[in-house]
Regions:
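Bacterial N-terminal signal peptides
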Residues: 7-16
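Positively charged n-region of N-terminal signal peptides that target proteins for export
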Residues: 1-4
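Carbohydrate-active catalytic/glycan-binding domains of CAZyme proteins
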Residues: 18-169
Length: 169
């Protein structure tokens, strides 16, 4: 009985220390319109900025990189690529995949570099990995690899990069 009473007193004293009031901040908030379609977005943080990338479907240049300090106000600072040129299927004349864009990008910051992984949405089904030290600067193609549908980069201290995915057959 004494142990039960001691337990209840302990719980009661802990609960008395909890505040029942909520802190609210009054104000008007407005989410400004981004004049773009921003599906499948991916966000990473580096320093005081957040960086976001999204699918561009059929638009070139592709892989818009946007920057924000507050996750509300965004500015486009670069594009990962102007056009895809490593396969003749991406040519505008007689091409078959150029108009289908790049899908489900993933952006990450690791050890002073930014990494972007994305896939075009048609044959030849190969994923691209780009890198840049300055996300507002020039992006360089690091690798073309097996196609991964809606993949995401996962960076570790012991490896440059790693990806997770469901392979497309």
């Amino acid at each position: 009985m004494k142990k039960m009473m001691l337990a209840w007193l302990t719980v009661a004293s802990l609960l008395m220390g909890c505040s029942g009031s909520e802190t609210s901040v009054k104000g008007t908030y407005r989410n400004p319109v981004i004049y773009a379609d921003v599906p499948d977005m991916s966000v990473t943080r580096a320093g005081e900025y957040y960086y976001m990338i999204s699918t561009t479907m059929h638009l070139m240049p592709g892989g818009p990189v946007m920057r924000s300090k507050d996750l509300v106000n965004w500015e486009t600072v670069s594009y990962v690529f102007d056009k895809l040129t490593d396969n003749s299927k991406y040519d505008l004349i007689g091409g078959t995949v150029y108009g289908r864009g790049q899908w489900a990008s993933s952006i990450r910051y690791h050890n002073g570099k930014f990494y972007v992984l994305f896939s075009p949405n048609d044959v030849p089904y190969r994923s691209y990995i780009f890198t840049a030290e300055d996300p507002a600067g020039k992006w360089e193609l690091l690798s073309r690899t097996q196609h991964f549908h809606d993949a995401s980069l996962f960076l570790m201290m012991t490896a440059e990069y790693m990806y997770s995915m469901e392979p497309v057959s």
